[in-house]
Amino acid sequence: MSSNEAYHEPGAGGDGPGGSSGASGGGSQRSNQLHHQQILNETTYLKPAAKQAYFSDEKVLIPDDDSTNVGFSFRKLWAFTGPGFLMSIAYLDPGNIESDMQSGAAAKYKILWVLLWATVLGLLMQRLAARLGVVTGLHLAEMCYRQYKRLPRWILWIMIEIAIIGSDMQEVIGTAIAIYLLSNKVVPLWGGVLITIVDTFTFLFLDKYGLRKLEFLFGTLITIMAVSFGYEYIVSAPNQGEVLEGMFVPWCSNCNSNVLLQAVGVVGAVIMPHNLYLHSALVKSRDIDRRQTKKVSEANFYFFIEASVALFVSFIINLFVVAVFAHGMYGKTNNDVVEVCKDKSMYEDAKMSFVDNVNGTAIIDADLYKGGLFLGCTFGAVAMYIWGVGILAAGQSSTMTGTYAGQFSMEGFLNLQWPRWCRVLVTRCIAIIPTFCLAMFSKMEDLTSMNDILNAVMSLQLPFAAIPTIAFTSCAAIMGEFVNGLGNKIVSILLTIVVIGVNLYFVVVQVENMEIKGGLLALVCIFAILYILFNLYLVIHMAACMGNQRLMNSRWVQRFVLPSQNSFSIKNANSTYARIATSSDQEPEGLAGEDA
């Protein structure tokens, strides 16, 4: 029996650990076969397939310090360090950097507290995703494969793929703009878009050199971003008192609708749907003995500390960007920036980019390219090139983690494993074709303004990651003793409602700004109805996961919502992934050579 059978959808009639054993003789043997098939289908010890992303060749061993009776071990923390920092890169992609710029230019430091609390909310959601992977040994997409019917599972996969491709387009745009700046416009935007194809495949082969070396590379890219944007923060020297006030005073006096929209955009940019799928899979790279409750608790503890540190670093980097452009661009018009650039080499570029209206009162609409020009005019060419290096690091690191997220999504939802190069070729081509056309035939403004549309698209996908995460981590049959408590459930649901509501508001405003009419408006309305209905379906499933007996006993819910023909399901509370301790490497007696 191949190791890939651990991914097959369970067949009918399998008995859980608490189920009946059947008759003696042949019935008993068949019962044992079915019980073993359940273990193969739902084991926490998944033998990595040859093409599985990220951790196919090795797992990081966790040092055993139990004999020394050490309460907190930095050796163990170091062993668990890696997945959280890879996850945090999604908080630092070019779309986030541009959102930081725009919020600083529009509201100065007034909505820094929104960035802070959005990061905290993101941490709480990432904690749930990581716990799911640690406790069950299955990541979020693999769990969706087991817990949803075929049609909703496919819809979920399509939605997450849209989010991944949207994020990939932002990364392509950011990388192309960075190359354009660093090459002093020698490499055109469309050339930078094409270069992203080549460099992505180059990076894909780096994980062949070892898991820890790959994680070190990601850490290096984060360090480059911290140094680059930290340099800009130091040379711009914003008022530290105002920065602290903006962080810790949750208020925004004299803020107009544009500032409110920027605040909503910050939340939408920070909390990325595909990142929950990514993080739940990355934690599987550590060798954790799930048969021991103590080891699982320990892993949850150290992963949470690591994620907290990683997101703290990402928050500081985002803070640097907001503060730099809040200090330099807030309240200024395009003409003000052009005046600053008057005696600089980038004066002509500034005149073409910072175009003012007739009255000379147009407020700056910040984007990645304009940010580089502004820094170059204000602090010299070195500042512009350092900005370009930071954006390049953001684009490259996000590209790689996006590739892994796509690989995990495809492996989990479809039980399909493609080689990484094939997966990247398909995703990257889908992202590059529209981006290349814009870069080839449109202006820089069209390329950068696409980020707003992409942020709106990704905001729509958030429920398709948040609701399954809360549902599975709140299900006792899945999480065992690690299930969310009542307080955790209430807080998670309330926070998710707030975040999803904020994101939907952002989407509605963006759609209104597009002034959609006629047949296209009718299509948008139909999509909105289907979108609401599917979210309602996911909420019903979540309520059943949380133990709502009325829903679980409903024939309609049993037929259309709950997993069927699955010995492990939310209907079988005696069977938990956390307590299965059988390796799929061993074939039990009576099953050798049998195709289960």
Curated annotation (Swiss-Prot):
Expressed in macrophages and in the nervous system. Pfam families: Nramp (PF01566). One of its GO terms (cellular component) is endosome. It is found in: Membrane. The keyword Iron-sulfur does not apply. 'Malvolio' is a character in Shakespeare's twelfth night, who 'taste(d) with distempered appetite'. This is Protein Malvolio. The gene is Mvl.
